[in-house]
């Protein structure tokens, strides 16, 4: 039923537009994890009769408030009314039989309730506004980890963040536990289902994967499956280059030496994987963030596991237009690290391929951003791997629409070579690469298949400056 409202100004924040405009080459981290299962809805209800029953127009899980205005709490559940019917069904009712306070017969009142999220809640979504993330996926909490990770990533400066909220509500599909008390088996099924969505995303929608979990057992190898996914998608045939970042479970009671050895062993375990350069392990395993309770308004520090640190690293990597910019010695904000390692412990972990976050003064920084592949600078440095993938992605953008489907003439070969050289010159200007060997650039027709154009060239990426060695000698007297 419609209702009257007096003339006036009623401010309301609108949701962020669904279409997100990003620059060509923007890199997007995707956060995968648990979020809210219900959302708030407010309806205007007309009271049928005193002591009677009024049906809600939609399925509802619980009542938030009932009042004469949309933001008022006036009528109290069990004292003034009962909430009856089958949970999450369209036959939920406000039953005024307790004979407490109630609206007059024929009067309108407002019911705010929580209803199950729509089915598209579990699809891929991209956001640039953390308030919109909270509205859709729920407030930050230990159960809404997808919100925590996405907000942290945006706070580090990434242009946008992708979210896939795992679906734990389809209880018939899970071995045990269900949505209220999910087990490792339930999480494994839910995270595995999310891989089906990730396989449909292109590189401009998904660059870095951050599953908000540390579960990776032999029985439930969530993170191992995600690394295999990153490897498969990064094959030349798939053309969707990806990296996985993970943390470890929070172990606040463990000693530094125990945690050091665990991180070292974890990074070493990825060393032999074909996609080791696409695996980033971040330490420490516990971080804290101050979160305000939406109901009480009280702010408190909450401890999270290393997946939150992984989300922060992903957000910082994707924050720069230039993929050559490393996260080494960059500042991180919006959370704090709970564990402080000695330099000796950090050296041991870094020597095994762990990216460590530490305090320099009062500022949290990444000590050295590295992958688990220590073969050489081209595989160890996160920024160099990012350059590699950036060149691949931009090569498609530069060449595919312009040349694929053209007649394969000598003029086309010359034009392709000119485009490649111009593209690489731009990369030098943008400081993505340091140089390339122009004499090595060749564009030829494949000898075995006349439809294939082969391009080859030698490129020198822009390496990060990590060490400065200073040597000097003292001398006595006026001259050396």
Summary of predicted features, one role per range:
Residues 1-480:
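Surface-exposed assembly/interface segments
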């Amino acid at each position: 039923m419609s209702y009257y409202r007096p003339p006036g100004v009623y401010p309301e924040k609108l949701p962020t537009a669904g279409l997100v405009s990003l620059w060509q080459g923007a890199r997007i981290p995707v956060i995968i994890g648990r979020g809210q299962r219900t959302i708030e809805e407010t309806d205007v209800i007309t009271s049928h009769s005193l002591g009677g029953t009024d049906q809600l127009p939609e399925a509802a899980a619980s009542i938030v408030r009932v009042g004469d205005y949309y933001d008022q709490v006036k009528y109290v559940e069990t004292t003034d009314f009962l909430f009856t019917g089958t949970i999450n069904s369209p036959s939920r009712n406000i039953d005024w039989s307790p004979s407490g306070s109630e609206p007059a017969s024929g009067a309108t009142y407002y019911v705010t309730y929580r209803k199950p999220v729509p089915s598209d809640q579990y699809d891929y979504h991209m956001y640039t506004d953390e308030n919109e993330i909270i509205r859709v996926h729920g407030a930050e909490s230990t159960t809404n980890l997808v919100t925590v990770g996405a907000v942290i990533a945006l706070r580090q400066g990434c242009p946008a963040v992708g979210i896939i909220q795992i679906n734990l509500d389809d209880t018939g599909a899970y071995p045990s536990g269900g949505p209220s008390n999910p087990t490792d088996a339930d999480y494994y099924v839910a995270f595995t289902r999310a891989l089906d969505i990730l396989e449909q995303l292109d590189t401009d929608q998904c660059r870095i994967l951050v599953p908000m979990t540390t579960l990776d057992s032999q029985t439930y190898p969530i993170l191992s499956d995600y690394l295999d996914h990153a490897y498969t998608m990064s094959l030349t045939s798939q053309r969707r280059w990806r990296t996985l970042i993970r943390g470890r479970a929070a172990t606040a009671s463990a000693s530094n030496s125990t945690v050091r050895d665990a991180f070292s062993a974890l990074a070493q375990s990825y060393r032999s994987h074909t996609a080791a350069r696409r695996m980033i392990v971040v330490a420490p395993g516990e971080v804290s963030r101050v979160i305000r309770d939406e109901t009480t308004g009280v702010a408190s520090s909450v401890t999270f596991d290393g997946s939150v640190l992984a989300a922060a690293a992903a957000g910082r990597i994707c924050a720069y237009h230039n993929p050559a910019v490393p996260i080494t010695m960059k500042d991180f904000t919006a959370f704090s690290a709970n564990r402080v390692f000695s330099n000796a412990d950090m050296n041991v972990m870094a020597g095994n391929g762990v990216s460590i976050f530490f305090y320099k003064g009062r500022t949290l920084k990444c000590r050295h951003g590295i992958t688990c592949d220590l073969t050489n600078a081209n595989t160890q440095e996160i920024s160099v791997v990012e350059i590699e993938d950036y060149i691949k992605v931009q090569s498609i953008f530069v060449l595919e629409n312009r040349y694929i489907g053209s007649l394969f003439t000598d003029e086309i070969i010359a034009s392709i070579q000119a485009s490649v050289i111009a593209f690489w010159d731009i990369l030098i200007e943008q400081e993505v690469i340091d140089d390339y060997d122009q004499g090595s650039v060749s564009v030829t027709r494949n000898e075995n298949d006349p439809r294939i154009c082969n391009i080859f060239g030698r490129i020198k990426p822009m390496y990060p400056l990590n060490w400065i060695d200073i040597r000097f000698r003292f001398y006595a007297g006026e001259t050396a």
